[in-house]
Amino acid sequence: MSPTDPLDDEDTFKILVATDIHLGFMEKDAVRGNDTFVTFDEILRLALENEVDFILLGGDLFHENKPSRKTLHSCLELLRKYCMGDRPVQFEVISDQSVNFGFSKFPWVNYQDGNLNISIPVFSIHGNHDDPTGADALCALDVLSCAGFVNHFGRSMSVEKVDISPVLLQKGSTKLALYGLGSIPDERLYRMFVNKKVTMLRPKEDENSWFNLFVIHQNRSKHGNTNFIPEQFLDDFIDLVIWGHEHECKIGPIKNEQQLFYVSQPGSSVVTSLSPGEAVKKHVGLLRIKGRKMNMQKLPLRTVRRFFIEDVVLANHPNLFNPDNPKVTQAIQSFCLEKIEEMLDSAERERLGNPQQPGKPLIRLRVDYSGGFEPFNVLRFSQKFVDRVANPKDVIHFFRHREQKGKTGEEINFGMLITKPASEGATLRVEDLVKQYFQTAEKNVQLSLLTERGMGEAVQEFVDKEEKDAIEELVKYQLEKTQRFLKERHIDALEDKIDEEVRRFRESRQRNTNEEDDEVREAMSRARALRSQSETSTSAFSAEDLSFDTSEQTANDSDDSLSAVPSRGRGRGRGRRGARGQSSAPRGGSQRGRDTGLEITTRGRSSKATSSTSRNMSIIDAFRSTRQQPSRNVAPKNYSETIEVDDSDEDDIFPTNSRADQRWSGTTSSKRMSQSQTAKGVDFESDEDDDDDPFMSSSCPRRNRR
């Protein structure tokens, strides 16, 4: 449909829908560095050409939680280029915006700000890549919101319960209730749904007249018993769900026969993992809503780098390959070379009809060498395609297929972790590795004081959010709590009794999940507070504080038996940090990257002794060591096991969750009209004008509910 289609009247919402844009992905790569920015430019251009009312993003606008200056600058540049202008906005917000955007310093929609000239508003929830972190719980979307380019909604301020208040929009006679829920850890949100702690508030008046649109960013496919959100958990009054986080493009609305709503999964706009789901052609959606009818038009993205993947099982070609043949390796290389050439030919044919597509495609040939075969040197083989593919280092991946045990063949659990190439394990999470390690570890190395879940959360904060104090603060907090427990119980100072009481206390905390959640939150808040204090104290240093000669520092540090050698012409401004010979860290005194995370001042001589003796240390010795040796450096463990996640979307059937009715009301200023709301069900009356409605072919079915 063209922008001047007669169906696009004054009563029809036109919404451009996209998710998982991942700005900044591989931005330092010489070939793929600009892919995300080019595709984001195309998405915004499609919105402008189709004259949409607004853009709806389903999370993960940024790939990194703390995007680089280049990424943030490019994003702001494109939003300013396409979303600002004199074209009037044709819809109005009639809900209480102080509730919808209450966490913002500017709690109103951006196009109603008199200081801004917005022609295409952007509404977005946050994803798991760009979620709020730090002491102030801010994310990159909050920066865009403060700048006036994005309306960040769907943020939950509580970790115990979630009340989802819709943004109520109206265009002509069409009323749209826009619900959003930013990314929450799946296991926590799953538990909230089970405990009926998630409430979707509804308009109190004229419930039947609203089209209910819900945007969510969670696991849709099953990755574990509670590590996903079943569609059956969602309220049945919803008309359409826009599901982010899953990268495979399934943008055509699919009806859930149990809940009777439709689910659209737009998928990502960039290939972030070389897995089969990413090979599906990428689209964004042009969603039209008129009354209670909707239509989703697929808009192909033409600037996405094409990705071709193919699997080869050597054992399936006994006439070509014999593992006992001394020249079988040369035969396998020739076979793989032929397969890759075929994929390159297919990529070239597709590109001939689309000049906007990048020149070098992504190629992945997965070779199953089980059956007695041996892999060859992949790097040497890949040198043949350096100038022809965008991923020359991992064109071929060798793996061995592992049989799944305990399968009946009737029902497949698509969420079980199976063997997968390490580069394809994009859905594997850090806390899963921690939990899996301690579940399979021997008894003598099992945790006896700390909890697996707490350690998993702390490691995730350290790796994903670069909270360098997360692990240390969690250990310190749980140790302090255990010590208080033992003091209150007046336990005899016998090692056996202390060990037994500590184990009992740990088991009781594991059974009480709410208490364990509180522990993790308290430890993480401590870590964020420490980081904020560190950043504040660092920024408070003046030039006078740092401008004294290093010769003075050398004299002051004589007790440490470390000699500081002043460098030529750079003696001033370095004294308090110590000489460069003490550490390889850059200027500034600490490294906060993922591989270091500990400040230089903590790398004392006692840390090595602590880490070397901690392996066989009893609990009572650990208590003593906390007073004698405050430094904690734990040698990292390497996990070489590769995990594979099946991305199939086959759903298990879950019983419908009963929900309590709740009512609410809100008041607004002259700029934001009032609207009271409730959580009762909707009576769907028969539409008498279906024959005349232009959206009949894609309309929602007529439903009768209490």
From Swiss-Prot:
Motif GAR in this chain: 570-594
InterPro entries per record: Calcineurin-like_PHP_ApaH, Metallo-depent_PP-like, Mre11, Mre11_capping_dom, Mre11_DNA-bd, Mre11_N
Entry comment on modification after translation: Phosphorylated by ATM at Ser-674 and Ser-676 in response to DNA damage, promoting MRE11 activity: phosphorylation activates MRE11 by preventing the interaction between MRE11 and the C1QBP inhibitor. Phosphorylation at Ser-648 by PLK1 primes for phosphorylation at Ser-686 by CK2, inhibiting recruitment of the MRN complex to DNA damage sites. Asymmetric dimethylation by PRMT1 promotes MRE11 exonuclease activity.
UniProt-listed Gene3D superfamilies: 3.60.21.10, Mre11, capping domain
Cross-link type Glycyl lysine isopeptide (Lys-Gly) (interchain with G-Cter in SUMO), residue numbers: K384, K468
Modified residues (Asymmetric dimethylarginine): R570, R572, R574, R576, R577, R580, R587, R592, R594
Catalytic residue positions: H129
Compositional bias per record (Low complexity), positions renumbered to this chain: 580-589
Crosslink position(s): Glycyl lysine isopeptide (Lys-Gly) (interchain with G-Cter in SUMO2): K255
Binding site for Mn(2+) 1: D20, H22, D60, H247
Regulation: Interaction with SAMHD1 stimulates the double-strand-specific 3'-5' exonuclease activity. RBBP8/CtIP specifically promotes the endonuclease activity to clear protein-DNA adducts and generate clean double-strand break ends. DYNLL1-binding inhibits the activity of MRE11. MRE11 activity is inhibited by C1QBP: in absence of DNA damage, C1QBP interacts with unphosphorylated MRE11, preventing formation and activity of the MRN complex.
Molecular function GO terms recorded: 3'-5' exonuclease activity; 3'-5'-DNA exonuclease activity; DNA binding; DNA endonuclease activity; DNA helicase activity; identical protein binding; manganese ion binding; nuclease activity
Protein name as it appears in the record: Double-strand break repair protein MRE11
Taxonomic placement: Eukaryota, Metazoa, Chordata, Craniata, Vertebrata
